[in-house]
Amino acid sequence: MALNDFHVSEPYTLGIELEMQVINPPGYDLSQDSSTLIDAVKPQLTAGEIKHDITESMLEMATGVCRDIDQAAAQLSAMQHVILQAASEHHLGICGGGTHPFQKWQRQEVCDNERYQRTLENFGYLIQQATVFGQHVHVGCANGDDAIYLLHGLSHFVPHFIALSAASPYMQGADTRFACARLNIFSAFPDNGPMPWVSNWQEFTGLFRRLSYTTMIDSIKDLHWDIRPSPAFGTVEVRVMDTPLTLDHAINMAGLIQATAHWLLTERPFKPQEQDYLLYKFNRFQACRYGLEGVLTDAYTGDRRRLADDTLRLLDNVTPSARKLGADSAIDALRLQVKKGGNEAQYMREFIADGGSLIGLVQKHCEIWAGQ
C-alpha cells in the first residue's frame, strides 16, 4: 500500500490518546464489555473520540487537534465525565495503569474489527497478550523532513518519557520487578523498538515501501515503533508511555512532549546520526526496569548518568519552550515528581507493601480515575 503524503499541520499542535482499562467489579478483573460502553457514550460526545482498541477490555479516548494542553485537558475531562457516568450505569469501572495486575491474556477477546482480526491472524496470541494500556501523544509538524528530525530528536528522551510515566509493575498476578513491564509485551513483534534509520522523508517513503513487501504492513498503524510519523495527521506520535492513573499526569506528559518538540525544532540541538541508536535499547531497558533510578550510557563517550538527573536537565532545557506554549505548569509538576523521586509504579508497590491486595489496587485505581 502506498504511503500517504505528509499532511501539513500547524507545528506543535497536540493530540492525545489514552488506552483505558474497562473493569468488572466486584472482582476487579478486566471486563469484556467495552463495546457496550462505547455504544452508550458515542452519541454524547461533543469533541474528541471514544473507540475500540485491540480487545474488548480496552477503551481509547482520543482528543481532536488541540492548540495547547488546556484545550486537550478540557476535551479529555469532558470524555472522562461521560465515560464514568455510562460505566456507573453499566456497573463497570474505568482506570489507568499500563497493565492490569492479574488479568489472564487467554481470556481476552479481540474486537470484532477487520483490522484487529487481521492482526490476530498475523500475530496470534501476541495480540491477546497486548492487552496493555498506553498513552500516545501526537505533535504537529510542518513537513515530512521536520517530522523525521523530530522523531530522531525525541528518541534521545524515550528513557525519560518511560521513567516518568512508568505504571506497570504487576502482570499476570506477579511483581515483574520492572517499573514499566508493559513495553516488554511488544518485544516479540518484528517492529518493536526504534524505527529503522532514515535521514529524511524521501528515505522514509522508501523504507515504508520495502516494509509493505512483507504483506504484514497495510498502513502506518501496523507499525509498532516507539515513535512513528503519522503522515495522514501531519504528526509525530510518541508511544512509549504507560497510561497514567490520573488525567493530570497524562496532561503533564503531553505538555513535556510538546515542549520538547518545540525546543528540538527551534534550537536543533542535535545532528541526527545512526550511531545515536547504538545503545538505544540498553538505555530503554534501564528506564523500563528501574524507572528514574536507571542509568543512561552515552553512545559516544561512555559517560554514565542517573536518569533522574538527566530528566531534570531535560526539564530545564525545555522550560522556555513550555512557557511559550502554555505548558509550564506541566514542567513544574514533573520537576517536582523527579525531585520527590517517584512514579506511579512505586506508589503501586507501596500500596501492596502496606498490606493491600492486587484486587484492592485495581479498586483504588478506579477510585483515583473517578476523582474519589
Curated annotation (Swiss-Prot):
Catalysed reactions, as listed in the record: L-cysteine + L-glutamate + ATP = gamma-L-glutamyl-L-cysteine + ADP + phosphate + H(+)
Keyword ATP-binding: yes
Gene Ontology biological process terms in this record: modified amino acid biosynthetic process
A matching Pfam family: GCS2
GO molecular function: ATP binding; glutamate-cysteine ligase activity
EC number: 6.3.2.2
Tagged with keyword rRNA processing: no
Keywords (A to Z) from UniProt: ATP-binding, Ligase, Nucleotide-binding
Family, per entry: Belongs to the glutamate--cysteine ligase type 2 family. YbdK subfamily.
Subunit structure: Homodimer.
Function: ATP-dependent carboxylate-amine ligase which exhibits weak glutamate--cysteine ligase activity.
Protein name (Swiss-Prot/TrEMBL): Putative glutamate--cysteine ligase 2
Organism: Salmonella paratyphi B (strain ATCC BAA-1250 / SPB7)
